[in-house]
């Protein structure tokens, strides 16, 4: 932004103003006294006066601006020895750059401080000058200089970052300030925090200059998480350095290690009191941990190794223990801290099988009161009064179960119904309760007191346990629960019990409809479980359809105007799963019957429209923001406030929507992906089923003929019966056709008001017509291909015949050749035999003679060589003998020496082989 | 993680001479023929042993382009060692050595140890700078010299270790005040806190606390 031109305009305006012009001439006079005065004392008084005037009013700051800077900079440059003048100059400068509070009242007024910052930072030289002042002895000089730099940074960040970067040793000087007296150190900390915001190169240089060591030593000095706001500043600086730089993350890991940051999370003894500052400090440290867990903000594909290495090292350094202590065992930690802790635990094990196993093996508590950490987390989920905490802890199970068949199986293996508790013992009292028992207890807690909240949280966990795991699904399907009142009713499968709770929840909801009492997520979460469970699982479909009421209820739910978009959508998906995963052939329970029921209840158009409505809702829309965005903590927030803010923000986004905002986090990307893919499959399959009604009457042309021996009457009766059956089928089809026509007509009626439905219906028609046309086309194509195939096979057969003849011929000539070869071989063998036997020695005289000659020659040659070698060896041996004698004279253990030499040469030979 | 000394290195030289490859070969023992241009500065670290003492090397790999010079200069002063690299197959990278050296002399501390590396010596058939010329340049400017290949790993270990050994020797000879971290040296556990500290038995303030 170019403020200079505006500045001129404003100055002009100010000059036009009488009062200001007075001020201006006053300042002019002061500046004159400062630069041209001869009496040192007078100059000092003048600068003190100037300083107080400038600090007071916006107008004075404006008037000071362009004229004042050269004078002040001159003092700083050339009169360093006059400490008082330098101090005064710096204070004046600071005054000119600090916005005056009551100036805000007059909104039209130009912010003089802003313009002055702009003027001053325009010259990089000025910044260099200021940085050089940091080396002055005087405390105040350094202190004011830091404040001036901070003020400039706040107003013209980029320019200052650049200027400091290009000043040789500029950053070094600032870093040195961290080792200065406390007041200066704190000031420097703030400055560096601003300086490192979104400036990667500065971040790296700051780290190069040893920032990590300095930061952690300050944190330690200040008492870790118990320290004051300085600790928070330190952590903010640290987070700036680590947020987007994998290079800096590696450096921390490879040099200081992660212990210093992890140890900030360590609670000393039992902590009862979490002050606001301590909470903020812990949250900041958890943010650091989270950055390390997530690697760089924008994950490049190749740089995944950094992220994984971070996760491994963090767990090696016992981070999990501290997190569990903070999030699970410490009952006094504020909810915000506990939530952040769960998020970190979840991310730490996400896609990291080893860390997952370590978490699974962790136990908490002491002596006999130990229990697996996962059980403790489950208990928190079931019992916490905070929805945020439930969602955060739920995330741990989500990441634990994802692509972890073994872990899911381990959790599911304990899903064994306990005999009904006689006295209602409390969950918290029994650390010996298995994971599965606790989960089942949670699931059934609706039975006793209609506590569907706990039930739905348990349902959420169960959906992680069965997700994508057919064995766990089957296992859970086999669970049969006793009837709450044994006298009434029979035992009930878990799956059906959960469907029943869904029904209870929806009836409760419709009763409470008039009350504006908050949004609920109970039905959605239970539906999520049922949808997840039923995927790829015909047994679940069967179990669902075992009771005719279920289908009726689900159809009601899909069309229930009181239900939310999301509930209706998920119910439709569940309904669709009853079609696509239906393996039943039983009348009334097969895929066709379900489709039929849908068609009769609401019509396919209206059914499909539920999907679209849901996909358009905020939870499914792709524009939904990732739930984990970077949000800096302000310097003095109250944690509870921060939480409220967060919820508010989400609320803002979903205004006018009936679904609970927490579903944003609970419906993770993989679930949303699942729903989308299911939707596609369902549409396809339903059209398929609908367009091919199974025929009740098999038409076999031969049946229509009079059978031999059949008399006319019987024949006619048979035909009559046949025609009756066909007639009823035609009636049936006509009725269906009418329903479909009505569906089309009614969607046509809604055409004007509801474009989307109309579109859906024409899409439907098109799809059906398309499928018929396709079938026709396919059949004729098939005919063509069959014909072509026949021709091909025929020609193939004839060519094969030819081939066979040829092969036969070949075989014959081959066998002839073989025979003659064998004959030749036989002759040769005979010859060899006779040669060996010496029966005909003169048959090949030349060869024998030559062979003999060559043999002799070779023998002679090798003999010669051997002789040479022997001579050499003899020489060597005598040498060794001589040397040995000499060495013995000198007192050396010759045998040992010779042995060593042997070993060495062996070793050498070996290594040469490598 | 504990070390007797920590040395900071920088790697400088024209773009494309193989600085990043040398660092990768040294820290990860691998060669990556195609990789991104270094933007600004990248970091690597490794532990070595000299005189039976564990020594941690922190290495900053800089970008060679002119536009990054002002940034990379910030790293000179705090470095104990510099690897100045040229490419034996590209004459101009050798010709630029003087300007790099000038930069280093101007911004680095006077005791910085500089190792001149003629890289890509595996490409002997494309050689454009003879070994003797490299030697001669090093001799004239008081540098240590080696030809190396980041591709075959030839002399890569040696170059980094020889530099460290030289720095180590300088410490033993009392050239540095090692309590002053601006020389790019830090004393950890088991390191001698410099000759002066050794004599009067006090340990230096700067080192050892955070190993
Ligand atoms: N043959 C060969 N190629 C190398 C060697 N070192 C680096 N290179 C190649 O030279 C190019 C530049 O390397 P790089 O490390 O990015 O250079 P930098 O700009 O100095 O960091 C890359 O294509 C490398 O594959 C080496 O020792 N031998
Ligand atoms: Mg590079």
Swiss-Prot record, chain A:
Disruption phenotype: Dwarf plants and accumulation of the precursors of the two major storage proteins albumin 2S and globulin 12S in dry seeds. The gene is GC6. The modification Phosphoserine is found at residue 911. The C-terminal domain (689-914) is necessary and sufficient for Golgi targeting. Golgi matrix protein playing a role in tethering of vesicles to Golgi membranes and in maintaining the overall structure of the Golgi apparatus. Functions in the anterograde transport of storage protein precursors from the endoplasmic reticulum (ER) to the Golgi complex. Keywords: Coiled coil, Golgi apparatus, Phosphoprotein, Protein transport, Transport. It comes from the Eukaryota. Pfam families: Uso1_p115_C, Uso1_p115_head. Its main location: Golgi. It is found in: Golgi apparatus; Golgi apparatus, Golgi stack. One of its GO terms (cellular component) is Golgi membrane. It comes from Arabidopsis thaliana. GO terms for biological process: post-embryonic development; protein exit from endoplasmic reticulum; vesicle fusion with Golgi apparatus. Residues 723-837, 863-901 form a coiled coil. This is Golgin candidate 6.
From Swiss-Prot, chain B:
GO terms for biological process: endoplasmic reticulum to Golgi vesicle-mediated transport; protein transport. It comes from the Eukaryota. The modification N-acetylserine is found at residue 2. PROSITE patterns: RAB. Its main location: membrane. It is a lipid-anchor. GO terms for cellular component: plant-type vacuole; plasma membrane. It holds the Pfam family Ras. Keywords: Acetylation, Cell membrane, GTP-binding, Lipoprotein, Membrane, Nucleotide-binding, Prenylation, Protein transport, Transport. Signal peptide: none annotated. Intracellular vesicle trafficking and protein transport. Belongs to the small GTPase superfamily. Rab family. This is Ras-related protein RABB1c.
